[in-house]
Amino acid sequence: MDKKGEIVFVNGPVVKADKMNGFIMNELVYVGKERLIGEIIELEGDLATIQVYEETTEMQPGEPVFSTGSPLSVELGPGIIGNIFDGIQRPLPVIAEKTGSFIKRGIEVNPLDRDREWTVSVKVKLGDRVKPGQVVAEVPETSIVTHRVMVPPHLSGEVVEVVPNGKYTVDQEIVTVKDDKGNNHQIRLHQKWPVRRPRPCGERLPIKKPLLTGQRVFDTFFPLGMGGTAAIPGGFGAGKTMTQHQLAKWSSADIIVYVGCGERGNEMTDVLEEFPKLEDPSTGKSMMERTVLIANTSNMPVAAREASIYTGITIAEFYRDMGYNVALMADSTSRWAEALREISGRLEEMPAEEGFPAYLPSRLAEFYERAGYVKTLGQDREGSISLIGAVSPPGGDFSEPVTQNTKRYVRCFWALDKSLASARHFPAVNWLESYSEYLEDLSGWLKENINEDWIKLRNMAMELLKEEDRLQEIVKLVGEDVLPDNQRLILEVARLIKIGFLQQNAFSKVDRFATPEKQYWMLKIIMFLYEKARPLIKNNIPISRVKNNELFSEVIKMKENIPNGDLDKFKDLMARIEEYYNRLWENYQE
């Protein structure tokens, strides 16, 4: 804190300061008389360029810049889950108590509550040898999440001091470890970690399990592997945020980190209002007991958007290291890219495509490459981070740089379609433009845990949808009536798949979440109906008789009429379909 520079230039969030000898790259600094938080992004001799994470209005040359000696870091410890932070990990509820509805410039608050006492259960004893990532104590952070206090990476040695089980604050020392050089290191309930440095892991593992979302279009047609990466691009009003909310509510991850990056404040308010009322499907507890929110809304300083993405992924890595499966939702990475473009412009850097900086692809890669399914340091634990980034291309144009560069680093592409959203088809995922490269990796798990037919049924349904798209070109020109009955049957069954299976109601208590078993049975029913109807059409029974409106309507409504826990009703429906078509065949035989 003894080093001090002097501001010589202010341009929005970009500040230049002189007399910065001894400062380091990416160091966290306090800028101006109000001590605004900033980060050094360029050093040239004694001159430093600083990215300021708060409004610089009324700042002037001559004001001081104070050193901290450490990079931009987050505090990792109990108290993160269930909390809401801004982009630089300041807890918004604490700021609201101090300054009211608006964040006062230069306000300093601790990310974690220093006064709250946590019940600590120590897991090591004197004389034990510990290694990086080993769990030394456990804290019940919420009724769902047990917080594991770990030996920091790069520290190993012998335990020389241990406190008894009891209640402790995050600042109190729990365990003291003597390293091989004879130095003592105190382990507290919290540790700091630089946001731009990925946390180390033991080993990266191949992705074998799906991240189940309860959304049929994703789980069945375009599944995401646990530890995988996905992008949700879509124009304005296509349903990106609603889809992200659904994924945050119902996905099978243990921890959800939701980063609202440059989007509207009302969207974060929706999350705050809804999540406490919702039950986690696997535990029955409140959703907020497994969720971390990072809110960096559109009216907050632009520079902090970049920090919010890194803050979120660092918190996700911390819980991954404990052995949890974490899902991080970033809404939206386009706003982060726009922040990079704005700051790059103020730095007078050479622009690349559409004004974005030339390093946009490498920044996106840095972010998405921090996902993965890993074996953690220390004990034999496995954890994962699944990254789902929304992309907001202007005018829904998927050829723009952010969407195109994101496609290079993700293996799951869920393209949202404005025309589907306008037709009230949600989730508005275009099944012809979307893809998942995880299907082959996950096929073993799906066959073993759901049914051997899963992939076969999915591929049959996809072929029908593709064939229906080709037929629609003819229908638009000459109408449906001129098509032969076998092609009209394809149109009818594709309609069943689209309305009865792919369309899902986020506000329905029955339909908002579908178990894999229910999804399998729904698709099986539709394909069973197609397989029973096709031979009848081949034998010249007219489509008007084959298409029984009552039966087709029942198939469409099965998503609402048959709850997750009552799968026997599918067998009854299948029996009725078989009975109808057998009777129809017999009548025509006579």
Curated annotation (Swiss-Prot):
GO molecular function, one term: proton-transporting ATPase activity, rotational mechanism
Keyword Ion transport (UniProt): yes
A Pfam short name: ATP-synt_ab_N
Residues holding ATP: 234-241
BP-aspect Gene Ontology terms: proton motive force-driven plasma membrane ATP synthesis
GO CC annotations on file: proton-transporting ATP synthase complex
Catalytic activity as recorded in UniProt: ATP + H2O + 4 H(+)(in) = ADP + phosphate + 5 H(+)(out)
Gene3D superfamilies: 2.40.30.20, 2.40.50.100, Bovine Mitochondrial F1-atpase, Atp Synthase Beta Chain, Chain D, domain 3 (1.10.1140.10), P-loop containing nucleotide triphosphate hydrolases (3.40.50.300)
EC assignment: 7.1.2.2
UniProt keyword annotations, A-Z: ATP synthesis, ATP-binding, Hydrogen ion transport, Ion transport, Nucleotide-binding, Translocase, Transport
InterPro entries according to UniProt: ATP-synt_VA_C, ATP-synth_a_Xtn, ATP_synth_asu-like_sf, ATPase_a/bsu_AS, ATPase_F1/V1/A1_a/bsu_N, ATPase_F1/V1/A1_a/bsu_N_sf, ATPase_F1/V1/A1_a/bsu_nucl-bd, ATPase_F1/V1_b/a_C
Stated family: Belongs to the ATPase alpha/beta chains family.
NCBIfam families: PRK04192.1 (NF003220)
Purpose: Produces ATP from ADP in the presence of a proton gradient across the membrane. The V-type alpha chain is a catalytic subunit.
Protein name stated in the entry: V-type ATP synthase alpha chain
Organism encoding this protein: Halothermothrix orenii (strain H 168 / OCM 544 / DSM 9562)
Gene: atpA
